[in-house]
């Protein structure tokens, strides 16, 4: 294992980047303290920085790289599309092909629309839910992340029965007055909130598994009770499966748990690692979108040919190679081995995860956002740097999920477990 690494070239690049890019990064999650490493290349399960250090990667671009980096099947699909052109501004057969494939795996989706990001997908889904129901309010889960648009950037922890306050400057408090919050895994509070607001409540949007603060898993029966509650009160249920879609199973969390929402958002994996987002749902809802209906949505890069071509290759490969059986088995092994390490070390930590997602919480097992916040964030950050020095790249935040790819080898996993054992 690597005991020391040099990041001088990355440090110099960071100093230059700060003069040109706010914070030196294009997304805040990449701003590793005291400075991030800058990637030069990636292949398979490995990622290499400017200084030549190589790491086993469990961040995987925060989820999309389910086949690892630079996969030949995805690369060939992109190369073939590049030869035909990469942006037309017209419909393509590729869109129809991928739409048909996605809909075949997701029982909640009769029709869908392609966008360029997960943020666009959830933003458009909420607009559509409001337009379809002619109602204004929606409920999100405390700690649930649905992208960077104004309506969902609301602080968690302010109480499920109070109106949300913006979590960023630049968002008027009046704008988020229709954004309500409920704790995850708390069906009683959710029931009270739904029943109190149902006359003006368009939807409940939820990550079935909270992937951006964990993963934190649903307690047994929680999703089923939520589905029943929304149906009884004529409120739309939206599953944000940007992380779990094609990750837990071909049909995402709704296949894994057997709970079917009214609408679904997808991203990350479905584009094969290229920019994409999807929102879909029941036909009567989706037909409200322009030009068929009066809910407007548009985008120059929506249905980008290269992204859609990569998505077709990704979906076909995942299905034909039965990838999820291998992935989920590796996830089970990783979590069991980590639990044994934690127990042997006598640590008050908790190993959590599902399918090919895993994490060690530096604290007790959390079931909601407030419990996640009790974890030792500084302790985790120090651990992250020790793992990086040992050649293992994990997400730098206690609140982000680790992912396993189809190309992580047995040797990769054993080296990783050795690093955990040495560095916890």
Swiss-Prot record:
Q: Which PROSITE patterns match?
A: AA_TRANSFER_CLASS_3
The highest taxon in the source lineage is Archaea
Give residues where N6-(pyridoxal phosphate)lysine occurs. 268
Reactions the enzyme catalyzes:
(S)-4-amino-5-oxopentanoate = 5-aminolevulinate
Q: Organism source for this protein?
A: Methanosarcina mazei (strain ATCC BAA-159 / DSM 3647 / Goe1 / Go1 / JCM 11833 / OCM 88)
- InterPro entries reported in the protein's UniProt record: 4pyrrol_synth_GluAld_NH2Trfase, Aminotrans_3, Aminotrans_3_PPA_site, PyrdxlP-dep_Trfase, PyrdxlP-dep_Trfase_major, PyrdxlP-dep_Trfase_small
Q: What is this protein called?
A: Glutamate-1-semialdehyde 2,1-aminomutase
The organism's taxonomic lineage, starting at the top: Archaea, Methanobacteriati, Methanobacteriota, Stenosarchaea group, Methanomicrobia
Extract the SUPFAM superfamilies matched here: PLP-dependent transferases
Alphabetical UniProt keywords? Cytoplasm, Isomerase, Porphyrin biosynthesis, Pyridoxal phosphate
The GO annotation for biological process reads: protoporphyrinogen IX biosynthetic process
Per UniProt, the enzyme's principal EC class comes to: isomerase
Q: Which NCBIfam families match?
A: hemL, PRK00062.1
Citing just one GO molecular function, the answer is:
transaminase activity
This entry's Enzyme Commission designation comes to 5.4.3.8
Q: In which pathway does it act?
A: Porphyrin-containing compound metabolism; protoporphyrin-IX biosynthesis; 5-aminolevulinate from L-glutamyl-tRNA(Glu): step 2/2
Q: According to its UniProt record, where is this protein located?
A: Cytoplasm
Q: Give the CC-aspect GO terms.
A: cytoplasm
As for family, the record states: Belongs to the class-III pyridoxal-phosphate-dependent aminotransferase family. HemL subfamily.
What cofactor is needed?
Answer: pyridoxal 5'-phosphate
């Amino acid at each position: 294992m690597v005991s020391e690494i040099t990041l001088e070239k990355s440090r110099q690049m960071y100093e230059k980047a700060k003069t040109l890019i706010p914070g030196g990064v294009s997304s805040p999650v990449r701003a590793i303290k005291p400075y991030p490493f800058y990637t030069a290349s990636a292949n398979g399960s490995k990622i290499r920085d400017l200084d030549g250090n190589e790491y086993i990667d469990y961040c995987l671009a925060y989820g999309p790289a389910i086949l690892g980096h630079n996969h030949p099947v995805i690369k060939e699909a992109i190369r073939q599309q590049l030869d035909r052109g990469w942006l037309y501004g017209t419909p393509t057969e590729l869109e129809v092909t991928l739409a048909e494939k996605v809909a075949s795996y997701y029982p909640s989706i009769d029709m869908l629309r392609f966008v360029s990001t997960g943020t666009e997908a959830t933003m458009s889904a909420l607009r559509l839910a409001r337009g379809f129901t002619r109602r204004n309010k929606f409920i999100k889960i405390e700690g649930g992340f649905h992208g960077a648009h104004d309506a969902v950037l609301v602080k968690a922890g302010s109480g499920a029965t109070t109106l949300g306050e913006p979590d960023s400057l630049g968002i008027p408090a009046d704008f988020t007055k229709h954004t309500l919050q409920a704790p995850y895994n708390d069906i009683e509070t959710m029931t009270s909130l739904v029943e109190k607001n149902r006359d003006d409540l368009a939807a409940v949007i939820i990550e079935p598994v909270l992937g951006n603060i964990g993963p934190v898993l649903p307690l047994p029966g929680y999703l089923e009770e939520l589905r029943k509650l929304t149906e009884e009160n004529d409120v739309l249920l939206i599953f944000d499966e940007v992380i779990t879609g094609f990750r837990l199973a071909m049909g995402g969390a709704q296949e894994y748990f057997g709970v079917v929402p009214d609408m679904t958002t997808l991203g990350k994996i479905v584009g094969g690692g290229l920019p994409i987002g999807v929102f879909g749902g029941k036909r009567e809802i989706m037909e409200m979108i322009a030009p068929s209906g009066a809910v407007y949505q548009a985008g120059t890069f929506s249905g980008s040919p290269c992204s859609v071509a990569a998505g077709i290759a990704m979906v076909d490969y995942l299905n034909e190679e039965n990838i999820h059986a291998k992935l989920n088995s590796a996830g089970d092994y990783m979590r069991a081995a980590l639990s044994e390490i934690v127990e042997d070390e006598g640590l008050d930590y908790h190993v959590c995860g599902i399918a090919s997602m895993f994490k060690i919480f530096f604290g007790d097992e959390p079931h909601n956002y407030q419990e996640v916040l009790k974890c030792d964030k500084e302790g985790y950050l120090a651990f992250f740097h020790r793992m990086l020095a040992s050649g293992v790249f994990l997400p730098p935040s206690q609140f982000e999920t680790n992912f396993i790819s189809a190309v992580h080898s047995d040797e990769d996993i054993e080296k990783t477990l050795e690093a955990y054992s040495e560095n916890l």
